[in-house]
From Swiss-Prot:
Keywords: Cytoplasm, Cytoskeleton, Nucleotidyltransferase, Nucleus, RNA-binding, Transferase. Belongs to the TENT family. One of its GO terms (cellular component) is nucleus. Signal peptide: none annotated. It catalyses: RNA(n) + ATP = RNA(n)-3'-adenine ribonucleotide + diphosphate. Catalyzes the transfer of one adenosine molecule from an ATP to an mRNA poly(A) tail bearing a 3'-OH terminal group and enhances mRNA stability and gene expression. InterPro entries: TET5. The gene is tent5c. It comes from Danio rerio (Zebrafish). One of its GO terms (biological process) is negative regulation of cell differentiation. This is Terminal nucleotidyltransferase 5C. SMART domains: DUF1693. GO terms for molecular function: poly(A) RNA polymerase activity; RNA binding. It is found in: Nucleus; Cytoplasm; Cytoplasm, Cytoskeleton, Microtubule organizing center, Centrosome.
Length: 388
């Protein structure tokens, strides 16, 4: 009995009922029309999150896959809880909690999601000849399936050219659902979805559903305090994967501060090591970095350079697991990416104001070395030459 009481206590500690202001922001997110952009000649779909979530859920249950609950996850959940923390939410990340005992369920889920997209095609489009494969090629940005002993989940990400992809994740089990306390929030949507089904009245301060938020970090109040005060904290850092380094630097560039700088200095070393374990090849590192910049800095182009400089500093100061040339290779990749970002912003300094200093080769110091060819020159040349 004591153990049941402890479990109940932990659950209540990790959950909290949303205020009306938070429910109102949630309603805005769920009812806003989000464009899903098609490739080639395929039309743009106007999708409201509440509609696609309801339709997918109902059709999954008709096909025998019971949905335990549906949750809003990630930066969008953080936006609902605390509106102004210096960053805008990106992907619309929704989790369907389901049982996935066999791989066959993954195919069924994909079929349901793709067939649902047909209902969002504009009137006048001939749907008869459009196959699921065609819809996948036209509208799916990313398709992921993970089926191991510890992780069973799939992700279907629908394309948005502005970086606000609709991400539908179907989760049976997953080892870790957050990296830091500020991205550990999930908002349970079932009561809101029922409200949309059953009530004809718009939500108001005096008439709205009770909505519960949960922190996977554990203590909801503590995690919300971290989000409000822009502080960085985590638990079980050994579970953080390689992408945690990129997320950590993203928080730093947005002026989040570690709760314990000394502790996080050690954690930086761990995150750098984990990054190079998960992405050992320079080509993989480049692909990962470019994908992260593309998906997390839409509309924030000027922040990219600052982010890259922070990432370079952390890698330079905290990398202990690499050979010297490997470390320099990664630092060079980050520097070149930063330079390209400046070029894209037309922010490269005027070269006329830059002075270049040339270091003589070591053998020039050798007093015995006198094998110089001296060319005659009739005009005087200044000591320092401008780069242009």
């Amino acid at each position: 009995m004591a153990s049941a009481s402890t479990s109940s206590s932990n659950e209540s500690e990790s959950q909290s009922v949303l205020t009306w202001e938070q429910v109102s922001r949630l309603n805005d997110v769920l009812t806003e029309a989000v464009p899903v952009h098609g490739r080639g000649n395929f039309p743009t779909l106007e999708v409201r999150l509440k509609d696609i979530v309801q339709m997918v859920r109902n059709r999954l249950e008709l096909r025998g896959i019971m949905v335990k609950d549906v949750r809003l996850n990630g930066s969008t959940a953080s936006h609902v809880l605390v509106q102004d923390i210096g960053w805008s939410y990106k992907d619309l990340d929704v989790i369907f909690r389901v049982d996935l005992p066999r791989e066959e369920e993954f195919q069924l889920i994909k079929d349901v999601v793709l067939s649902t997209l047909l209902d969002f095609l504009p009137e006048g489009v001939n749907k008869e000849k459009i196959t699921p494969m065609t819809l996948k090629e036209a509208y799916v940005q990313k398709l992921v399936k993970v089926y191991t002993d510890q992780d069973r989940w799939s992700l279907i990400s629908l394309s948005n050219n502005n970086g606000r992809n609709v991400e539908l994740k179907f989760v049976d089990s997953i080892r870790r659902q957050f990296e830091f306390s500020v991205d550990s929030f999930q908002i349970i949507l079932d009561s809101v979805l029922s409200y949309y089904d059953l009530s004809e009245n718009p939500m108001s301060q005096h008439f709205h559903p009770t909505v519960v938020g949960e922190s996977m970090y554990g203590d909801f109040v503590e995690a919300l305090g971290h989000l409000t005060n822009k502080t960085i904290a985590t638990k079980r850092p050994e579970e953080i994967r390689g992408g945690g380094l990129l997320k950590y630097c993203n928080l730093l560039v947005r002026e989040f501060k570690p709760t314990d700088p000394d502790e996080f200095k050690a954690l930086e070393r761990y995150m750098c090591s984990r990054f190079f374990i998960d992405f050992p090849d320079i080509v993989e590192q480049q692909r990962k970095l470019e994908a992260y910049l593309q998906s997390h800095f839409i509309g924030e182009e000027r922040n990219k350079y600052n982010y890259l400089m922070i990432l370079r500093r952390v890698v330079n100061e905290s990398t202990v697991c690499l050979m010297g040339h490997e470390r320099r290779q990664t630092l060079n990749l980050i520097s070149l990416t930063a330079f390209r970002v400046l070029a894209e912003q037309n922010a490269i300094p005027d070269v006329s104001s830059v002075t270049c200093y040339y270091q003589p080769a070591p053998y020039v110091k050798d007093l015995n070395f006198n094998n110089y060819y001296v060319a005659s020159c009739n005009q005087s040349i200044p000591t320092w030459l401008p780069c242009n």
